[in-house]
């Protein structure tokens, strides 16, 4: 599965990363794994990095599923980074499903803008201790 996440408890931040071909099933599995992690707190901010996804094979109905929509609290600030048009459009649709009065989900084309919006310092692409939901640890590029 081409997904990984890191939960940075001191910064109250979840960094998610997807790459390669991303399917609906993989996206749902990713969110389930995140929710089941004991370090996860739904009020944490999220930085989702979709820059390395080459194909989005995601059904828009899945974007509105309870598994995805109810994972984070409505007050959690969430930044999705999707530079290509398909990823940006799907992220926008997902944002519409998770609508909150606070407008706490934003879609960006550049990582720097997303980090600034979340109030983070610039960081590299390495997730460090990311939890890889792939079948083998060697599948993470």
Predicted regions mapped to residue ranges:
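Amphipathic, Lys/Arg-enriched alpha-helical "gate/interface" segment within cytosolic domains
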Residues: 1-141
